[in-house]
UniProtKB/Swiss-Prot annotation:
Gene of this entry: rab1A
Naturally occurring in which organism (per UniProt): Dictyostelium discoideum (Social amoeba)
Protein name: Ras-related protein Rab-1A
Region spans: Disordered: 180-202
Domain of life of the native organism: Eukaryota
Compartments reported by the entry: Cell membrane
Stored SMART domains: RAB (SM00175), RAN (SM00176), RAS (SM00173), RHO (SM00174)
Binding site for GTP: 15-23, 33-40, 63-67, 121-124, 151-153
Keyword field contains GTP-binding: yes
Molecular function as annotated in GO: GTP binding; GTPase activity; protein serine/threonine kinase activator activity
PROSITE patterns: RAB
Family as reported in the entry's similarity comment: Belongs to the small GTPase superfamily. Rab family.
C-alpha cells in the first residue's frame, strides 16, 4: 500500500519560555491564535501535510518547553530531528542572547547535519522591538543558517518559516541520496515508517 506522503520530517521548536513557540505552531498547523499564554509542559506536537515541488511532505512538529526544569525531558527529542527552529522574542533581548545557549543544546544533543532556522517572533510589536533585524540577520549569516522575523498573531512569515525549513531539509536529503539506498535513519521517498523520538541521527 502506498503511503499518502513522500517524506516525513520531524521538526523541533526550541527557545526561551514565552517567545511564542506554541503560537507559531498553532498558527501554522491550525491557523489559530490565542492571546492567552500557557507554558508548554514538557512537549507537544502537531502534524501538517504540505506540498513542495510536487512532493507531499508530512511535518511532525514538536513544541518543547523552554523552562530549564524541562531540559532533561526535551533533550531526548533532539535525536532524530531533521530540522530545528530556534525562536526568540524581538521585544526581549535576553531571549536573543540565549540563542547561543540553544544552539549549544543542538550541538550537544542533535545530529551534526541537522538543519537549523533562526526566527525572531512578535514582529508585530514594532514599538517594543529591541532586537534589530540586521543584528539578528548578521548573526544567522555568520552561522550560515536562514533567518526570518515572524508574527504568529498577524500570521506574518509563519508559513514561510516552516516552508523554508522543509525546503532546506528536502534539499539536504535529496543531495545526500543520489541512489535509492535506504538508510534506516533517513526519511526517503516512499517511506511510511513513523519517526521515533529516540531514533538515530538523520
Amino acid at each position: 500500500m502506498n503511503p499518502d506522503y513522500h517524506y516525513l520530517f520531524k521538526l523541533l521548536l526550541i527557545g526561551d519560555s514565552g517567545v511564542g513557540k506554541s503560537c507559531l505552531l498553532l498558527r501554522f498547523a491550525d491557523d489559530t491564535y490565542s492571546e492567552s499564554f500557557i507554558s508548554t509542559i514538557g512537549v507537544d506536537f502537531k502534524i501538517r501535510t504540505i506540498e513542495l515541488n510536487g512532493k507531499t511532505i508530512k511535518l511532525q512538529i514538536w513544541d518543547t518547553a523552554g523552562q530549564e526544569r524541562f531540559r532533561t525531558i526535551t533533550s531526548s527529542y533532539y535525536r532524530g530531528a531533521h530540522g530545528i527552529i530556534v525562536v526568540y522574542d524581538v521585544t526581549d533581548k535576553l531571549t536573543f542572547e540565549n540563542v547561543r545557549q540553544w544552539l549549544q543544546e543542538i550541538d550537544r544533543f542533535a545530529c551534526e547535519n541537522v538543519n537549523k532556522l533562526l526566527v525572531g517572533n512578535k514582529s508585530d510589536l514594532v514599538a517594543k522591538k529591541v532586537v534589530d533585524f540586521n543584528t539578528a540577520k548578521a548573526f544567522a549569516d555568520s552561522l550560515q543558517i536562514p533567518f526570518l522575523e515572524t508574527s504568529a498573531k498577524q500570521s506574518t512569515n509563519v508559513e514561510q518559516a516552516f516552508m523554508t525549513m522543509a525546503t532546506e531539509i528536502k534539499n539536504r536529503l535529496t543531495a545526500s541520496q543520489p541512489t535509492q539506498t535506504v538508510d534506516k535513519n533517513k526519511v526517503v521517498p516512499g517511506s511510511s515508517a513513523p519517526i521515533s523520538p529516540k531514533s538515530g541521527c538523520c
